Amino acid sequence: MSTHDRFIGGCDAKPRVVLALVQDHYVGVAEGLESLRQLGTTPGVTLVVWSASSAIPRDLQDRFAMAVGGCTFVEALPGDPEALLTYQGVYVPIASNGLAFALSEGDDRDAMERTVLLAAFLGMPVAILGIGWEPNSNPWLQAGLGRAATLWPDAWRMRSQRLRQLGIEILRTPEQATDWARRALDGPRVVDAAMIDGYLRRGQREVLVGVHTIVTPSAYVRLREYGMTLKTSAEKTWKLDE
């Protein structure tokens, strides 16, 4: 078995990643903890959590780890995807369906995007869950690399409307968060021409989709033009004339 196979959990493994963005004051909220516990113990799912390091003092780290069923606290990730493959302690849980907890600045979009790009680099679907976190932009979603929702039990109407305009679903309970993540990990809802352009800029030749993904006609035009292929999480790859 190659290093890559060992890293992603073996040749037959189909690992998936949920990237949770936890706003500082939501770290200890019961709904957030329960959502992370459910997602972190879902077979075949690796949970990576981003939060500001100042938000989690040592005593809360221990309490948080116990609440979510165990996790590893690490520093911010390196930017090079190749370096991430061997970065100790961060993605080791991918092989064991465990839980990884990464500390970073809560608004560090570059770090979040690196996590999403790493998942795409390894061929893993990714879902992005915000817990009390209201994004001002969603570049990783515009690139077609994941689906997003926010767990916000007390979201008020105007804020909810703005989030929905960004294509971000509002979730109210841990159960809704778990159900959403399982659906989202099947792949993006729609792949359009702009997403294909984003893949091309990053030098990717394959576009990962799920069984329920809609590929627009303009996206097919781009795929043919760029000589790219579609690939599902089930490892099926097909030519565009099939």
Which ranges hold each PLM region?
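Short amphipathic alpha-helical interaction/tethering modules
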Residues: 1-14, 174-242
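A cross-family phosphate/adenosyl-ligand binding-site feature
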Residues: 1-175
